Amino acid sequence: MGFTVAIVGRPNVGKSTLFNRLVGRKLALVDDLPGVTRDRRIHDAKLYDLKFQVIDTAGLEEAANDSLEARMRAQTEAAIQEADVILFVVDAKNGLTPTDSTFAEVVRRSGKPVVLVANKAEARGAQSGMYDAFQLGLGEPCPISAEHGQGMPDLRDAIVELLGEERVFADEKEEETADEVFTPKAVGELIGDDIEDPDEEEIPAYDATKPLRIAIVGRPNAGKSTLINTMLGEDRLLTGPEAGITRDSISVDWEWRGRKIKLFDTAGLRRKSRVQEKLEKLSVADGLRAIRFAEVVIIVLDATIPFEKQDLQIADLIIREGRAPIIAFNKWDLIEDRQMVLADLYEKTARLLPQVRGLRAVPISGERGQGIDKLMENVVKTHEIWNRRVSTGRLNRWLAGVIAHQPPPAVSGRRLKVKYMTQVKTRPPGFVVSCSRPDAMPQSYVRYLINGLRETFDMPGVPIRLSLRTSDNPFAGRAKKKK
């Protein structure tokens, strides 16, 4: 086994469930009662093509030095020292606790590469807990469901990105040399005074060879299954004139221009008032889960009756979930005056969905196979933008120019001070601005900053998250201490 992974976190966040998932057997006891795991357990594990040793640990808790809990914590800290990479697990369903923040600092001080794992991401309301996890300063959360096995491809990719392919695929004979040359990096943690030379910050290039997950969504009978069948070149999915044929969220493997793609066909999404039968409610919930675990979401609109209220609600849901959206105007073969209609559709797209200015929209005919390549070219471009990262140095030089040109307005006679900006995540791009009195910052100025980011750094058509914080730079002074 080439490397070691330690699973750590507070009690009852799902560490043992994840351990069982990775080893492929129920070796660790799992229960809703916190504190079931006491000793650290080590076992051979596999995650797709990755082979490694995984350590299950007791939940980290504050405890007196001579208590059982303190000895359990010592076991966990020993596991941290043994590990090459740490999976720090939080409960996205129930959100963060002060204990999470306390032990995130313990993990950070270890200096080991850390994957922040947001478990129970399939639960209703988990998105809020996942966003809260950014404040731990451990980088972008990786949403998973250890119980249901969802999000495992992203977890695999996160481990490879941190350790590097040479390290994770090294033979056992190469382990010692791999350990010597490895230097952990966490670009998402670099903010403020912690950066000595922003221009040297490395931004990884977009990997166009990685498998891509695409969900196909829309109102009933918009032509979603027909589109997928045309892509595949076979009648893989049941289609017909009756609305609502698709019930399950079906995933199929496909390859486009040498790139592996997983397509998710979903049940037609109706208004809640029209979703009555239990089976249909389950189908819609399944479709929503497919959206959450997809990367790019193609919104299929019937070009003959586009932009119904339900279409806009679906688009808004996708944007709020932070997915990379793209519109496919289907049934284009039924349109007569195509040039005039297309101009009208582009105008409506910009006017009705201003929160993703520059959203890509492509006319297609799923039945005749027209426009599929152009649609996929735009899918790949949107996915690249969704993964885009901007160096902290470039961001703050841009921010200084923005403030000089258009400073934040004064509120109650006091000028708002903006200190610095950093990008804390991708997928979608997320930024944090440190400023005085964030609650007083007008939303109009926040939108001004978002629009400026979108235009300056070429990020059209994807959601952009921007949060304001008043706390001091948590990494300030660290560089000074190292001297």
From Swiss-Prot:
What HAMAP family does the record tag this protein with? GTPase_Der
Per the database record, which ranges form the EngA-type G domain?
Answer: 3-167, 212-387
**What quaternary structure, including any partners, is listed in this protein's UniProt entry?**
Associates with the 50S ribosomal subunit.
The protein's GO terms of the molecular function aspect are: GTP binding
Q: Which Pfam families does the entry mention?
A: KH_dom-like (PF14714), MMR_HSR1 (PF01926)
The superkingdom of the source organism is: Bacteria
Spell out the SUPFAM superfamilies in the cross-references. P-loop containing nucleoside triphosphate hydrolases (SSF52540)
Task: Give the protein's recorded name.
Answer: GTPase Der
Q: Which gene encodes it?
A: der
